[in-house]
């Protein structure tokens, strides 16, 4: 796959977000420290960090008996009138939680806008979701949230969670999704009797460089929602907790080492859905997302929680941060191709591609190969692979295998060998290995000469699938170890820009620079 230089259509779903379409990989977060910042962190680690950590733990322990007493004898399926002593417990818990956040450096929490009453907006939609620190507005409002059922069994934390009456999702119950939606609808239709439900519709954490696709759960009830946007206007972003980046404890450590941590919570006007939006939760979600993106000054892009699997996949062919396979996955999903892909379908695609014997297709030929009309999405997919107006459909099949089977890299490599290998000995040459790895990683440039020579220990000028697999077992990080990506990364870094909150690598295969109309 390659990075076309031409400017293409944005990934924004229908409308003006009022911002530049210069996207970054939302699932990747990197931190780069200056020497002075490293020195500051070192000093804070042995002075302020342990004090803050101990005090925060103490405040959580202090909150536990209040939450425990308040939940004793309380019905899980009905809401009783709030008694005076439970009201006092609610105030005490809010004060304790605020003290805990204060001890962590969140000295000022700026709140803009007017929070709606539960009767006005039973659901709060909050974005962008970037960290466990997004719990700050939850503890300030004591609104209900949607959480996995296993959370209530965690000592101390589980009791605090049960106090806010969350909607629990059970991973072991295959019918859990339907039950969760029904419970949200039941509470949202209670005319303000239940506490508001605070939902993060993105469904996963990102680096706040854009708003990804909203899940429809918050919008299926068809009731008014209040959009709430979060900002962390810090000089250094130690908040973001993404699929590729610092781990949970490192984020906690670095954040507690900052002298001040700023957070802004802005309540936007309540959004009442139209009759059309009530019938179409996806449209409802899209329109709310557009309003939130405009308030944040961020682009919107149709990546989803499912795309995180690409970022999570481990192994020798772990995707680099600047891969354009995320864009490919979005386009494939847009065409409805991903749901139709099975192992058998991929094998059939590979056979069809091999029968072309390396013959390259133009855009019309590619559309016919996909059995799709000539749409914008088909043109965008073609642009990811084309060189001089032609493409090798084998590259498309490899990319399709990666996005549909992100955790089965060996199956993808085996499929690629089937399409490229010589019939007499099942081997491929260096140029073919380059194409396979470039496509499987979703990059535009790759240096594999050193890697190929290492695999081809007998200097035959070709390698087999078994030889590559054997080498992968000995060298699980072969792409990084043999510096295959160094040239591509350096070239891409020169084209990338860093954000004010840390460094987030660009991933789009396009040079997004035009404004949306």
UniProtKB/Swiss-Prot annotation:
Motif Di-lysine motif location, chain numbering: 514-517
Listed name of the protein: Lysophosphatidylcholine acyltransferase 1
Lumenal-facing ranges: 74-517
GO molecular function, one term: plasmalogen synthase activity
Motif placement: HXXXXD motif: 129-134
EC assignment: 2.3.1.23, 2.3.1.51, 2.3.1.25, 2.3.1.67
Cytoplasmic topology ranges: 1-52
Native source organism of the sequence: Danio rerio (Zebrafish)
Pfam families associated with the record: Acyltransferase, EF-hand_8
């Amino acid at each position: 796959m390659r990075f076309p230089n031409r400017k293409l259509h944005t990934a924004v779903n229908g409308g003006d977000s009022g911002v530049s379409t210069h996207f970054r990989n939302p699932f990747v977060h990197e931190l780069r420290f200056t020497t002075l910042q490293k020195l500051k962190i070192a000093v804070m680690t042995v002075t302020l960090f342990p004090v803050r950590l101990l005090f925060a733990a103490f405040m959580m322990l202090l909150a536990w008996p209040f939450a425990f007493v308040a939940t004793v004898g309380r019905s899980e399926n009905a809401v009783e009138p709030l008694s005076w002593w439970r009201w006092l417990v609610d105030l005490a818990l809010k004060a304790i939680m605020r003290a805990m956040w204060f001890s962590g450096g969140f000295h000022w929490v700026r709140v803009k806008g007017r929070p709606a009453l539960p009767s006005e907006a039973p659901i709060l939609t909050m974005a962008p979701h970037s960290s466990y620190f997004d719990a700050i507005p939850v503890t300030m409002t004591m609104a209900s949230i949607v959480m996995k059922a296993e959370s209530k069994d965690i000592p101390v934390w589980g009791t605090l969670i049960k106090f806010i009456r969350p909607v629990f999702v059970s991973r072991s119950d295959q019918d859990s999704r339907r039950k969760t939606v029904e419970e949200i609808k039941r509470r949202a239709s209670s005319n303000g009797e239940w506490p508001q439900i605070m939902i993060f519709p993105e469904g996963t954490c990102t680096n706040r460089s854009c708003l990804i696709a909203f899940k429809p759960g918050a919008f299926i009830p068809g009731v008014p929602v209040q959009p709430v946007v979060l900002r962390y206007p810090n000089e250094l972003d130690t908040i973001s907790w993404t699929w590729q980046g610092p781990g949970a404890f490192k984020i906690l450590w670095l954040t507690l080492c900052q002298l001040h941590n700023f957070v802004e919570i802005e309540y936007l006007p309540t959004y009442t859905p139209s009759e059309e939006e009530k019938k179409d939760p996806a449209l409802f979600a899209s329109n709310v997302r557009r309003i939130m993106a405009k308030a944040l000054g961020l682009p919107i892009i149709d990546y989803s929680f499912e795309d995180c699997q690409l970022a999570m996949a481990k192994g020798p062919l772990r995707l680099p941060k600047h891969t354009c396979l995320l864009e490919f996955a979005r386009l494939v999903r847009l065409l409805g191709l991903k749901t139709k892909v099975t192992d058998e379908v991929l094998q059939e695609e590979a056979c069809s591609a091999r029968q072309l014997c390396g013959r390259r297709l133009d855009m019309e030929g590619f559309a016919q190969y996909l059995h799709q009309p000539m749409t914008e999405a088909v043109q965008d997919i073609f642009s990811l692979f084309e060189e001089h107006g032609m493409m090798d459909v084998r590259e498309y099949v490899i990319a399709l295998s990666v996005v549909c089977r992100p955790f089965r890299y060996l199956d993808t490599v085996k499929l690629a060998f089937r399409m490229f290998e010589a019939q007499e000995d099942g081997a491929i040459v260096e140029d073919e290995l380059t194409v396979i790895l470039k496509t499987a990683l979703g990059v535009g440039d790759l240096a594999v000469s050193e890697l190929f020579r290492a695999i081809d220990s007998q200097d035959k000028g070709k390698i087999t699938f078994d030889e590559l697999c054997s080498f992968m077992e000995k060298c699980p990080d072969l792409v990084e170890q043999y510096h295959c990506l160094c040239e591509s990364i350096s070239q891409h870094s020169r084209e990338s820009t860093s954000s004010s909150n840390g460094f987030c690598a660009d991933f789009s295969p396009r040079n997004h620079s035009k404004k949306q109309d």
